C-alpha cells in the first residue's frame, strides 16, 4: 500500500505543480461526499479562473499607468476641468471627496495633483497636517470614516450552520439510505400498520439525521476556528503620526490624511502620496505585473496599496482606503482558490480510496450473497413467485446493509481528521505564540530534521545596549558610565560621534503622548541612539542642523549604511557610514586618535583595532564601526556614497543577551534528532561565542564565514555541510544556498527563520519558513509558513512538538479507524456468506460509523503533545506513514475482535442459554454491544502505538474523556431504550458485564501486541 501511495498520492508540502494536484484527485474513487471531502483542498478551477482574472486586471492597470505617465510627459498645457466639492463633503469641512482622491493616485494624475495644490494642498483639503497627522478626536475620525470609508476589503460572508448541514446531506450513501428509509416506512406501514411498521424506516432516518447533525457541528466548529485564524493572519500594524505623536495602528484603522511611516519590507497599506524620504524603491509586481521596481519621490509621489517597499524609507499621506484603492478593486474581483492540501490529507485520500474500493466490492458481494440466500429459501419452499410485504422489507434491509457497509468501509473521515487535528493544533499554537499561515507547515514541522536559525532576536533577546567602545583608539566600558563618558572623549570626536549617530540612522528619538522620550527603530539603532543621548546629543537639534543629501539604508548584502549631509559652514559635504566592523574598517585609511586628531591608519593601528574587534566578539558582543569622510569636489544625490577613504571614529560593542531557555531548547532538539544551525550576518567570533552559550556549537562542529562558504565547490560542500553548525557574515543568498543543499542533496526537512526582506528566498525555499512576528518585515511574513509571534527560539521548538503531535495523532486515528473498517467488513461479509444474515443492521452500522469517524477523530486527533514526543527521532522526508507497528496493532486487534464475534455467533445462544423467538435478536444485540465496547477500549489503547501505559495524561485531554463517556452513555440508551428503532433488545446485567469484559480484554491484548518487535 505504501509504495502505491508514494507513487500516486505523494505531494510536496509547498509548491506542488497543478498537474500533481490534478493527478491524485482523478485517482480518488468511491467518494461519498465530494463537497465535504474536498472542502479543505485547493479549488483548482477557481484558482485558474482567479489567475486569469488577475492577469487581465494587471494588464489593464499596467496599461493605464503607462499611458497616464506618458500622457503627462507630453500634455503639459491642458488644465484639469473645474472640480466641484460635493455638498456633504463641504458641510463636513473638507474640500475634496473620496472619488477625486482615488482618481489622483489611480491614474497617477500629476496635473490633477498640481491643480489641488500638490501634496500639501491635498493635506489642507483633507484637514490633515503633513507633520502632525490627523487629530485623534473621536468625532472627527468617525466623520472622516463615514465620508471616505474604512480600510477593509469586501469578504465572503461567514457560512452558517445550516449550510454545513446541507453539505453533510450531500453524502451519496446517506441519500440512498434516506430513500431506503422512506420505502421501508411506506411498505412497513402498509403491511404492519402504524406505528409498528414504521420502526425500521424511522430508525434509519433518525440515524441519518444524527450522523448529519454531528458531522455538521464538527465541520462548523472547524470553520469558526479557521475564520479566527484567518483574522489573525490579516492583523498588520503600521507606524502612524497622529496629533504629532508616533504610534502603532492597525491598517484597518487608517483614514485619508493619516501620515504613515514606511521602511524596507513594509507593505503599502493604502493608496497615498509620498511626503518625504530617501532612496524609496517600490515593487509593484503584485499589482501591475511589472517586475521592474519603481522609484518613488517628490516627482513620482504615487504609492499604491498592496505594493512592497523594496528599499529606502519614507513618510506617506493616505488618500484612498479599502475598496476604493486599486488593490481593493483587484481583491474584489478575485475568487479565493484555497490553500494547497497537505501531504497527509492527500495520502489519506489515497488510503480512503483503496479501502473504499475494497469496501464497495465487499458490499456488492454481501448484498449478492444475502439476496441469493433469500432466493434459495424461497426456491426450496416454492414461493419464489409470491412476495409478501415482510420479504420486500427484508430485501430492502439487505440493500440498506450493503449501502451501510459502504458508509463504514469508505473512511472519508481520514483526510478530514487531518484538518480537524490541524485546526485544533493551530488554535492551541496561537496561545503558544505561533501563527500558522499554511496548514501543511504545521504537519511538515513534525518531520523537521534541521532548523537554520537567525541569531539576533531569535536566540538572543533583541534588547541591545552598547556596553563597550573603542573611541579614538581607547577601549572603555560604556555600561553604567552615563554622562561621564562624554568627558573622557575629545570634544571634536564627541561632535563627530553625535553627528554620525543622529544623522546616519534609521531610528528616531521622539516625545510620546505621555511626554516621555522614546527611541524608535531596530534594537541595534536604538542602542546606538542611546549612546548618542548619553554623549549629550539632542536628536531633533542635530537633524535640523544638517541637510541630508543622500541616504543608503542598511541591507544584509552590503552590511553597512551611509548618509551624505551638507555642513552648515561653507556648504561642504560629509559622508558617514556605519556597519559590520571588519567591512567598514577595511574602507578606512585614517583614524581619529586619542587627542581627537585625524592620523593615517597604519599597520599597527589596524592590528590594534582588529584585536579589539575580536576581543569584543569573543565576549559575545556585536561590533559596529562608525566612520566619516569629507567629500571634495561636490556631491549629487545620484552619485553613490564612496566605498573607501573613510576616517574611523570608533568601534562599539553591543550586548544582546541569550534568551532564557534557549540552551535547554537546543538540547531538546538534539535529543529529538533535530540539528540546529545558526546562520547570522554577525562577526564569526561573536557568532561562535553565542553559539557555544546556546549549546549549538560543539567540539566536532564547524563555524564558517559566508564568503568562504561561497568559494567551495560541490564536492567540498558534500563533506562540509553536515558539519556546519555556525555560518557567520552570511548573505541572504548564502542562507538560500545552504537550505537548498540540505533539502536536495542531503534530503533533510529544513525549517528556516527569517525577519528581513532579503530572507524571502530562503523562507520560500525551506520546507517550513518561520518569520519573526516582532522584528519581521511584512515581505518576510508573506513568504513564511509560520509566524513566531514572540521571536523566541523556544517557540520554534514548541511548533516542532505540535507538528509531531499532529502527525502521531493522525496515525493513532488511522490505526483505530482501519481496525473498525476491517472488523465490520469481515464480520458482516463472512456472516452473510456462512449464515445468510448480517448480525449488524444498517442503524447499528451508522452508529459504529459515527463512533469511528466523527467521534473517533475528535478523541484521537486532538490529543495535546507530551514531552515524550521530543525523545523520538523525526520521521524525515521518506518515512512510511502507516508503519509496521500500526499494521501489527491493526491486524492483532482485528483478529481478536473477529474471533470473539465469531465465537458469539456460533456458540452465543448456548453460552447464554438463549432460546425462543427473540433469541436471534438477543444474540445480535449482544454481538453489537461487544463490538462497540471493543471499539471503546481499542480507542483507549490507540492513544499510544508503542507504549504500554495508555492512561498517562488521559485526563489532560477532556475531549477524549467526554467522547468515551458519551459513546458509552448513548450505547446504553440505544440498547435499553431504542430497541424498536435500532433492532436491539435490553440485555441482562450479566450480558452487560460480559460485553464490557470482552471490550476490556482487548487492552491487555493490545499491550501484548506492542511487545512484539516489528
UniProtKB/Swiss-Prot annotation:
The record, for SUPFAM superfamilies, names: Calcium ATPase, transduction domain A, Calcium ATPase, transmembrane domain M, HAD-like, Metal cation-transporting ATPase, ATP-binding domain N
Give me the residues that bind Mg(2+), please.
755, 759
Description of how activity is regulated: Activated by calmodulin.
Gene Ontology CC annotations of this record: endoplasmic reticulum; endoplasmic reticulum membrane; membrane
Which topology term describes how it sits in the membrane? Multi-pass membrane protein
| SMART domains tied to this protein | Cation_ATPase_N (SM00831)
Region Interaction with calmodulin: start and end of each range?
20-31
Q: What class of enzyme is it?
A: translocase
Q: Where are the transmembrane segments?
A: 161-181, 200-220, 349-368, 399-416, 811-829, 841-861, 882-904, 917-938, 957-978, 989-1010
Molecular-function GO terms, alphabetical = ATP binding; ATP hydrolysis activity; calcium ion transmembrane transporter activity; calmodulin binding; metal ion binding; P-type calcium transporter activity
Q: Which residues carry this modification: N-acetylmethionine?
A: 1
Q: Which residues form the active site?
A: 454 (4-aspartylphosphate intermediate)
Where in or outside the cell it occurs: the entry states: Endoplasmic reticulum membrane
Q: Which residues lie on this side of the membrane: Lumenal?
A: 182-199, 369-398, 830-840, 905-916, 979-988
State the Pfam families in the record.
Answer: CaATP_NAI (PF12515), Cation_ATPase (PF13246), Cation_ATPase_C (PF00689), Cation_ATPase_N (PF00690), E1-E2_ATPase (PF00122), Hydrolase (PF00702)
InterPro entries in the record, alphabetically? Answer: ATPase_P-typ_cation-transptr_C, ATPase_P-typ_cation-transptr_N, ATPase_P-typ_cyto_dom_N, ATPase_P-typ_P_site, ATPase_P-typ_TM_dom_sf, ATPase_P-typ_transduc_dom_A_sf, Ca_ATPase_N_dom, HAD-like_sf
Which residues, renumbered to this chain, carry the PTM Phosphoserine? 45
Q: Which UniProt keywords apply?
A: Acetylation, ATP-binding, Calcium, Calcium transport, Calmodulin-binding, Endoplasmic reticulum, Ion transport, Magnesium, Membrane, Metal-binding, Nucleotide-binding, Phosphoprotein, Translocase, Transmembrane, Transmembrane helix, Transport
- Cytoplasmic compartment ranges equal 1-160, 221-348, 417-810, 862-881, 939-956, 1011-1014
An individual GO BP term:
calcium ion transmembrane transport
Q: Give the protein's biological function.
A: This magnesium-dependent enzyme catalyzes the hydrolysis of ATP coupled with the translocation of calcium from the cytosol into the endoplasmic reticulum.
Domain observations: The N-terminus contains an autoinhibitory calmodulin-binding domain, which binds calmodulin in a calcium-dependent fashion.
- Family to which this protein belongs: Belongs to the cation transport ATPase (P-type) (TC 3.A.3) family. Type IIB subfamily.
Its name, as the record gives it, is Calcium-transporting ATPase 2, plasma membrane-type
Give the species: Arabidopsis thaliana
Query: What gene does this protein come from?
Result: ACA2
